[in-house]
Amino acid sequence: MANFTPVNGSSANQSVRLVTTAHNHLETVEMVFIATVTGSLSLVTVVGNILVMLSIKVNRQLQTVNNYFLFSLACADLIIGAFSMNLYTLYIIKGYWPLGAVVCDLWLALDYVVSNASVMNLLIISFDRYFCVTKPLTYPARRTTKMAGLMIAAAWVLSFVLWAPAILFWQFVVGKRTVPDNQCFIQFLSNPAVTFGTAIAAFYLPVVIMTVLYIHISLASRSRVHKHRPEGPKEKKAKTLAFLKSPLMKPSIKKPPPGGASREELRNGKLEEAPPPALPPPPRPVADKDTSNESSSGSATQNTKERPPTELSTTEAATTPALPAPTLQPRTLNPASKWSKIQIVTKQTGSECVTAIEIVPATPAGMRPAANVARKFASIARNQVRKKRQMAARERKVTRTIFAILLAFILTWTPYNVMVLVNTFCQSCIPERVWSIGYWLCYVNSTINPACYALCNATFKKTFRHLLLCQYRNIGTAR
């Protein structure tokens, strides 16, 4: 993260060139003010990042691969808020390092490992989003929770390997410790040029990479959002006309027999299907009811024509008495049903009586199935468009969050790293307090990150509110 400088100025860690003489110690009022401000920032940082971690833990809506990377970043920010901020504040207020060499090295190792892990997590987030928008067909299949865990572990392990051994054991490698007891800085960073080299690798190069990636992410996201944006009236009209001109599907429904009826007979208490007649007689209006013993029928509408029932084959029953031919009123079924009319016809031939049920389609053959198919296709198309728009909205939300995080990182880390660049060429050009403020701004980035999540993601914001108000039952429904 940052680099510390001893009082004599020979080191590159100019941010901690603290005054060690009594007459340069901070006044009491100034120390109280600094302690209050930095203590408040530390508390806000700790609480904010704990809220982030709890939100991801308890709300399943936030348990995504991208948010697991944010969880890792929140862990790093929590460590900075709990330890690094307070130890550096103690160093500033006291004017010297009062905790000894061992605590100094442990603090520096922790500070640099965690800060470097933050940068690595930001790089992972940027690359992850870049591959999501540029390779939407292949990358999501490999974007699993296991892969995210491996990437997060790699970021922390690499940061530890790069900084912790060098900070803790450099004095044993060279055979002596050159850092004074009342100061705290990294021993092997004793040259401003070396410090500048580490700043290039730890800040400038990652910033360039993340900026380029974000530009590509933004362009790709805008392209996808533009593709799925709502259509204008003219576009909708043109597409509707084209849809009406091109038939969706040719109905492959067999033409019904003349009269448009299928027949079923009620015989011996059972409803059985009877074959349609081979040669139907001429139609007859329903209004002319037949009162003879040949047949009697009912119809659902006055203008619907029907044919007389054909003689149905049945078992011989000489002893069966002839039954009167009842005339039943037709029933109209549910309009949404496939059939809408029922005709009950009774025929008496000789000594047996046969009752048949005719079910007549309400619409011409093929019209209702074709309409159903069209409605199904339209429903599927609407669902697909809605899902694509929801996906585009989620992408915009994630892109906004990444932009806010990267912007906060660049704004808070740039002042210190610019001072490192200037100090390489002019070691006396930057006042000591400016160094301290610049170094503290790097810590403030850990305070800002939780606010970025809440401002750019409504689900985070609602979950934060439920946690703070102890409304635990509403956490799972926060969206």
From Swiss-Prot:
The keyword Lyase does not apply. Residues 1-30, 89-105, 171-192, 423-436 are extracellular. It comes from the Eukaryota. Residues 274-285 have a biased composition (Pro residues). Residues 293-303 have a biased composition (Polar residues). Glycans are attached at residues 8, 13. Pfam families: 7tm_1. The chain crosses the membrane at residues 31-53, 68-88, 106-127, 148-170, 193-215, 402-422, 437-456. GO terms for cellular component: membrane; postsynaptic membrane. Residues 271-334 are annotated as: Disordered. The modification Phosphothreonine is found at residues 459, 463, 477. SUPFAM superfamilies: Family A G protein-coupled receptor-like. The muscarinic acetylcholine receptor mediates various cellular responses, including inhibition of adenylate cyclase, breakdown of phosphoinositides and modulation of potassium channels through the action of G proteins. Primary transducing effect is inhibition of adenylate cyclase. This is Muscarinic acetylcholine receptor M4. It comes from Mus musculus.
